[in-house]
Amino acid sequence: DLPTVPDGENRQLDVKFIGDLLVQWDPDVAIIENVQAMPSIPGADGQRRSMGAASSFRFGMACGMIRATVVAYSVPLVMCHPRSWKNHFGLKGSDKKQDAALCKKLYPSSEPFITLVKHHGRADAGLMAGWYADKQGML
């Protein structure tokens, strides 16, 4: 879940709020998934779907805004490719439900925060944190 503010008929990232959170929480590190625009893939109806040019631009802009905010607030940044954390947890080829189930199993205190399918990003964030902690010998 990312905080947003109105921007005409759309919404955009609230980087001021993200910066305020970084000051309040004073994290040792920020782990950001190194994502890319969605390629053309088959949809449930068999039709191919992909991210359009405008969507790709907005997605890339939001990714850049998050990274810039983290760097501007002097928080060490770790970029994590989805393949890295998914392979670490044996989730190659998994879907969002499997990722969420594993996060809740490994980190039971996360369960109240991952109750809906749309909360898969929270599960991903938990697993990325676990990937980093394992990599650093923290777990």
State the predicted function of each range.
Residues 1-139:
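Phosphate- and other anionic-substrate recognition elements at nucleic-acid/protein interfaces
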